[in-house]
Amino acid sequence: MKKQLIAGMALWASLQCGMAQSLEKMQWFNEPEQWKIENQALTMYVTPQSDYWRISHYGFTVDDAPFYYATYGGEFEVKVKVTGDYKTRFDQAGLMLRIDHENYIKTGIEFVDGKFNLSTVVTHKTSD
């Protein structure tokens, strides 16, 4: 069985973020309560404390953050612009390439101790 890669915008914590690219053709996994598409940009308010981690060294698994995605097969390019109202420790927003709940890569900007950091997590059965 050929696996398809799901590429989308994974958005965590309480952020507003934007993205312009065929937004109307994408779909939600864990749809947030408040969101809109306007002027080719996605704006959302995300449930606090939501995230993507699988059997991490912290001892927990979560798969509950909003994820706006499209399904692709073969090669593709993704270009996104991410902005957010980062306020709380670990607020983050970015891009996730996902095959299923056990196999994904998420990368983005994470706010930790008053500083912005580039963050990447690779999950293959467990998150690194």
Where do the PLM segments sit?
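Bacterial Sec-dependent N-terminal signal peptides
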Residues: 1-22
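Extracellular glycan-recognition regions
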Residues: 21-128
